[in-house]
Amino acid sequence: MLTSSVATISGNHIIAGNGVGGRNGFDGGPGQNGVTGSNGQPGQLSGPSGLGGVGGVLMCFGSSASGGAGGDGGDPGLAGQDGGSGFGPTPGAGGVGGAGGVSSPLPPGQDGASPLNGGSGVGGFSGADFGGFSFGRYTTADGGTGQLGQRGGGGGGAGGGGGLNAFLLTGGGNGGGGGGSGGCAGTGGGGGGGAGGSFGIVGVASTLTITGNTIETGNGGAGGAGGSGAPGGAGATGGLGATNDAPQVGAGGNGGAGGSGGAGGPGGGGGGGPTIGIAFHGGTVTESGNSFALGAAGVGGASPQGGNVGNTGRRTTVFSF
């Protein structure tokens, strides 16, 4: 490699070796499974109302995928409280509390809703057909890392049951179940490493006159394969609503299940190694009367299903980068 040089290269037989293959990318890590919501507490005739269950609590990379709290049972004659919505992308809505009244039977609280599962991460980009040069060395065209999937939303908390306020008979409603948390997303797979290339002559910011040479290049190395994205964690079930003395007092609804986390995206395949007779950046190259025998360009690295395969390396006699 010639840097900031003025040179004439003539009448030589130049033979370059083969490029080295790229490393394979790492596999992503699986997402954590969701946390189950807790059950609602019982209400009772001639007694107090039950508390709603707590939603499953889970943080994924600093963001909540927790389930919503279940609604408390209603005091005598009053409706149960509504359940809380879950947290996260597209969370499940909370259930409506059951109506209270002066006579039985009383309706149960509404179940909490379950959200959609988290989306999968986007695959990493393909390694290019050529990387570059830095400090006298070829820099490989690596594939990109797959993106993190989307966490699952938390399930909605269920509504609490209504309370009874009949003549000479009262009772508190049952608590609704808490929503299950969503699962955390899987992380993306690492990109495959770009392969080494084979170059006859390389000039950077140089003035070169290249005539009458025989220039043979070797084969470019094969790009490394992209790693697999990992699956997301499973969403957890919601807690059960209490049913004590139902339907004289309202039963609590069941908490919604959390959504599963999305899988991480696959890593992109590394770029195959180029095979180039004369490569230059900046400066000027005057080339004539040279004979070239180029090796095979390296194939791009594979990528798991849904990913981006690396590009085949560049194969050309003279290339300005």
Regions found by a protein language model. Give the residues of each.
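Glycine-centric low-complexity repeats
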Residues: M1-F321
